[in-house]
Regions:
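Hydrophobic h-region of N-terminal signal peptides that target proteins for export
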Residues: 10-19
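Extracellular glycan-recognition regions
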Residues: 18-227
Protein backbone atom coordinates (compact mmCIF):
# COMPACT_ATOMS: atom_id res chain seq x y z
CA UNK A 1 0.00 0.00 0.00
CA UNK A 2 1.20 3.49 -0.81
CA UNK A 3 -0.17 6.01 1.68
CA UNK A 4 0.00 9.53 0.31
CA UNK A 5 0.05 12.66 2.45
CA UNK A 6 -3.30 14.42 2.94
CA UNK A 7 -1.96 17.92 2.50
CA UNK A 8 -5.01 20.12 2.10
CA UNK A 9 -6.78 20.64 5.44
CA UNK A 10 -9.25 23.04 3.86
CA UNK A 11 -10.52 20.18 1.68
CA UNK A 12 -12.20 18.36 4.59
CA UNK A 13 -15.61 17.72 3.12
CA UNK A 14 -17.92 16.11 5.66
CA UNK A 15 -18.84 17.42 9.10
CA UNK A 16 -21.70 15.79 11.01
CA UNK A 17 -22.95 14.26 7.77
CA UNK A 18 -23.11 17.42 5.68
CA UNK A 19 -20.63 19.04 3.35
CA UNK A 20 -19.21 22.28 4.72
CA UNK A 21 -18.32 23.21 1.16
CA UNK A 22 -18.40 21.31 -2.06
CA UNK A 23 -15.06 19.55 -2.51
CA UNK A 24 -13.53 18.91 -5.90
CA UNK A 25 -10.22 17.45 -7.00
CA UNK A 26 -8.89 18.34 -10.41
CA UNK A 27 -5.68 16.45 -9.58
CA UNK A 28 -3.63 19.59 -10.04
CA UNK A 29 -1.83 18.65 -6.81
CA UNK A 30 -1.19 15.09 -7.88
CA UNK A 31 -2.65 12.21 -5.91
CA UNK A 32 -2.25 13.75 -2.45
CA UNK A 33 -5.86 12.93 -1.48
CA UNK A 34 -5.63 9.25 -2.44
CA UNK A 35 -4.30 5.95 -1.09
CA UNK A 36 -3.19 3.31 -3.57
CA UNK A 37 -3.41 -0.46 -3.11
CA UNK A 38 -2.08 -2.27 -6.16
CA UNK A 39 -0.56 -5.57 -7.20
CA UNK A 40 2.96 -5.54 -8.68
CA UNK A 41 3.27 -4.61 -12.33
CA UNK A 42 0.80 -1.71 -12.32
CA UNK A 43 1.06 2.03 -11.86
CA UNK A 44 -1.02 5.02 -10.80
CA UNK A 45 0.01 8.43 -12.13
CA UNK A 46 -1.41 11.92 -12.53
CA UNK A 47 -1.06 14.05 -15.65
CA UNK A 48 -2.99 16.97 -17.12
CA UNK A 49 -5.72 16.80 -14.47
CA UNK A 50 -6.29 13.06 -14.90
CA UNK A 51 -5.67 10.19 -12.48
CA UNK A 52 -4.47 7.30 -14.65
CA UNK A 53 -4.50 3.67 -13.51
CA UNK A 54 -2.56 1.16 -15.60
CA UNK A 55 -3.14 -2.16 -13.91
CA UNK A 56 -1.92 -5.72 -14.18
CA UNK A 57 -3.24 -7.73 -11.22
CA UNK A 58 -5.73 -5.58 -9.31
CA UNK A 59 -5.88 -2.03 -7.98
CA UNK A 60 -8.02 0.07 -5.65
CA UNK A 61 -7.43 3.81 -5.24
CA UNK A 62 -9.13 5.18 -2.12
CA UNK A 63 -10.20 8.74 -1.44
CA UNK A 64 -8.56 9.33 1.92
CA UNK A 65 -11.20 11.20 4.04
CA UNK A 66 -14.09 9.19 5.44
CA UNK A 67 -17.55 10.02 4.06
CA UNK A 68 -20.68 10.31 6.18
CA UNK A 69 -24.22 10.04 4.79
CA UNK A 70 -25.97 11.82 3.22
CA UNK A 71 -23.34 12.09 0.52
CA UNK A 72 -23.02 12.31 -3.25
CA UNK A 73 -19.82 11.32 -5.04
CA UNK A 74 -19.33 12.42 -8.64
CA UNK A 75 -16.54 11.84 -11.10
CA UNK A 76 -15.82 11.23 -14.76
CA UNK A 77 -14.05 8.06 -15.85
CA UNK A 78 -13.22 6.07 -18.94
CA UNK A 79 -11.64 2.74 -19.88
CA UNK A 80 -8.99 3.03 -22.57
CA UNK A 81 -9.16 0.91 -25.70
CA UNK A 82 -5.39 0.49 -25.52
CA UNK A 83 -5.97 -2.00 -22.69
CA UNK A 84 -8.58 -4.57 -21.68
CA UNK A 85 -12.01 -2.93 -21.76
CA UNK A 86 -13.44 -4.15 -18.47
CA UNK A 87 -13.90 -3.30 -14.79
CA UNK A 88 -14.67 0.36 -14.19
CA UNK A 89 -15.60 -0.51 -10.61
CA UNK A 90 -16.16 1.35 -7.34
CA UNK A 91 -16.67 0.92 -3.61
CA UNK A 92 -18.57 3.46 -1.52
CA UNK A 93 -19.39 3.67 2.18
CA UNK A 94 -16.76 0.97 2.65
CA UNK A 95 -15.63 0.02 6.14
CA UNK A 96 -13.90 -2.84 7.93
CA UNK A 97 -15.72 -3.95 11.10
CA UNK A 98 -12.37 -5.05 12.55
CA UNK A 99 -10.92 -1.53 12.59
CA UNK A 100 -12.24 2.03 12.80
CA UNK A 101 -9.55 3.32 10.43
CA UNK A 102 -9.70 1.54 7.08
CA UNK A 103 -6.01 2.25 6.56
CA UNK A 104 -4.70 1.21 9.98
CA UNK A 105 -1.60 -1.02 9.88
CA UNK A 106 -2.31 -4.69 9.34
CA UNK A 107 -5.41 -4.32 7.17
CA UNK A 108 -4.01 -6.84 4.68
CA UNK A 109 -5.41 -5.39 1.46
CA UNK A 110 -3.04 -5.56 -1.50
CA UNK A 111 -5.08 -4.98 -4.65
CA UNK A 112 -6.27 -8.57 -5.06
CA UNK A 113 -10.04 -8.64 -4.90
CA UNK A 114 -10.13 -11.41 -2.30
CA UNK A 115 -8.24 -9.17 0.12
CA UNK A 116 -11.35 -6.94 0.32
CA UNK A 117 -13.63 -9.70 1.62
CA UNK A 118 -13.69 -8.21 5.14
CA UNK A 119 -15.28 -4.96 3.95
CA UNK A 120 -18.88 -3.90 4.45
CA UNK A 121 -19.56 -1.79 1.40
CA UNK A 122 -21.67 -0.92 -1.59
CA UNK A 123 -19.98 -2.03 -4.79
CA UNK A 124 -20.62 -1.74 -8.50
CA UNK A 125 -18.68 -3.84 -10.97
CA UNK A 126 -19.29 -1.87 -14.16
CA UNK A 127 -18.40 -3.87 -17.25
CA UNK A 128 -16.98 -6.77 -15.27
CA UNK A 129 -16.24 -10.29 -16.46
CA UNK A 130 -14.67 -9.15 -19.72
CA UNK A 131 -17.35 -6.46 -20.13
CA UNK A 132 -20.29 -8.86 -20.02
CA UNK A 133 -21.92 -7.81 -16.72
CA UNK A 134 -22.68 -4.71 -14.66
CA UNK A 135 -23.62 -5.59 -11.09
CA UNK A 136 -24.49 -3.99 -7.76
CA UNK A 137 -23.70 -5.80 -4.54
CA UNK A 138 -23.84 -4.97 -0.86
CA UNK A 139 -21.01 -6.83 0.83
CA UNK A 140 -21.40 -7.73 4.50
CA UNK A 141 -17.77 -8.39 5.43
CA UNK A 142 -18.04 -12.19 5.50
CA UNK A 143 -16.70 -12.88 2.03
CA UNK A 144 -20.17 -13.77 0.71
CA UNK A 145 -21.06 -12.30 -2.68
CA UNK A 146 -24.85 -11.93 -2.74
CA UNK A 147 -26.41 -10.89 -6.03
CA UNK A 148 -30.08 -10.05 -6.54
CA UNK A 149 -31.25 -10.82 -10.09
CA UNK A 150 -32.41 -7.23 -10.61
CA UNK A 151 -28.89 -6.05 -9.81
CA UNK A 152 -27.29 -8.13 -12.58
CA UNK A 153 -27.35 -6.17 -15.85
CA UNK A 154 -26.12 -7.77 -19.07
CA UNK A 155 -27.78 -5.79 -21.87
CA UNK A 156 -25.36 -3.88 -24.12
CA UNK A 157 -26.60 -0.48 -22.94
CA UNK A 158 -25.27 -1.28 -19.45
CA UNK A 159 -21.79 -2.28 -20.59
CA UNK A 160 -18.66 -0.24 -21.27
CA UNK A 161 -17.89 1.72 -24.39
CA UNK A 162 -14.13 2.12 -24.83
CA UNK A 163 -12.67 5.62 -24.47
CA UNK A 164 -16.03 7.16 -23.52
CA UNK A 165 -15.96 9.60 -20.60
CA UNK A 166 -18.75 8.45 -18.27
CA UNK A 167 -20.28 10.76 -15.68
CA UNK A 168 -20.65 8.63 -12.56
CA UNK A 169 -22.75 9.64 -9.54
CA UNK A 170 -23.07 7.67 -6.30
CA UNK A 171 -25.61 8.43 -3.58
CA UNK A 172 -25.94 7.16 -0.02
CA UNK A 173 -28.32 8.58 2.58
CA UNK A 174 -28.65 7.86 6.29
CA UNK A 175 -32.10 6.40 5.57
CA UNK A 176 -30.64 3.79 3.22
CA UNK A 177 -31.35 5.27 -0.20
CA UNK A 178 -28.50 4.14 -2.45
CA UNK A 179 -28.03 4.93 -6.14
CA UNK A 180 -25.52 4.39 -8.92
CA UNK A 181 -26.03 6.68 -11.92
CA UNK A 182 -24.19 6.86 -15.21
CA UNK A 183 -24.48 9.74 -17.67
CA UNK A 184 -27.50 11.06 -15.74
CA UNK A 185 -29.30 7.69 -15.90
CA UNK A 186 -30.00 5.81 -12.67
CA UNK A 187 -28.77 2.25 -13.21
CA UNK A 188 -29.25 0.93 -9.66
CA UNK A 189 -31.71 2.33 -7.11
CA UNK A 190 -31.76 0.53 -3.77
CA UNK A 191 -33.40 0.95 -0.40
CA UNK A 192 -31.06 -0.67 2.12
CA UNK A 193 -32.83 -1.77 5.35
CA UNK A 194 -29.48 -1.73 7.18
CA UNK A 195 -27.81 1.40 5.78
CA UNK A 196 -24.08 1.89 5.62
CA UNK A 197 -23.96 5.44 6.98
CA UNK A 198 -20.22 6.08 6.83
CA UNK A 199 -17.17 4.76 5.09
CA UNK A 200 -14.74 5.31 2.26
CA UNK A 201 -14.90 5.62 -1.51
CA UNK A 202 -12.57 3.71 -3.79
CA UNK A 203 -12.10 3.34 -7.54
CA UNK A 204 -11.21 -0.21 -8.55
CA UNK A 205 -10.08 -2.05 -11.65
CA UNK A 206 -8.09 -5.11 -12.69
CA UNK A 207 -5.91 -5.63 -15.76
CA UNK A 208 -7.30 -2.51 -17.44
CA UNK A 209 -6.30 1.07 -18.13
CA UNK A 210 -8.70 3.65 -16.72
CA UNK A 211 -8.64 7.41 -16.28
CA UNK A 212 -10.51 9.56 -13.76
CA UNK A 213 -11.10 13.33 -13.66
CA UNK A 214 -13.33 16.00 -12.09
CA UNK A 215 -13.87 14.21 -8.78
CA UNK A 216 -16.19 15.81 -6.22
CA UNK A 217 -17.99 15.05 -2.97
CA UNK A 218 -21.00 16.95 -1.63
CA UNK A 219 -24.29 16.52 0.18
CA UNK A 220 -27.51 15.97 -1.76
CA UNK A 221 -29.22 19.21 -2.69
CA UNK A 222 -32.23 18.08 -0.65
CA UNK A 223 -32.96 15.02 1.49
CA UNK A 224 -33.55 12.03 -0.78
CA UNK A 225 -37.02 10.54 -0.39
CA UNK A 226 -36.61 6.82 -0.86
CA UNK A 227 -36.94 4.95 -4.10
Amino acid sequence: MRRLTFACVSCLVVLAGYAADRFSDDFSHGSDQWIIEQQPGGSVTVHDGVLAIDDAGGCTVWYQPKLVAPVVVRYEARVLSSGRVSDLNCFWMAGDPRRADLFAPGHGRDGKFASYDTLRTYYVGYGGNENTTTRFRRYDGTGARPLDPEHDRRAPQFLLKPDHWYRIELLATAEGHVQFSRDDEVIFDIQDPAPLREGWFGIRTVHSRIEVRNFSVSSPAAPAAGR
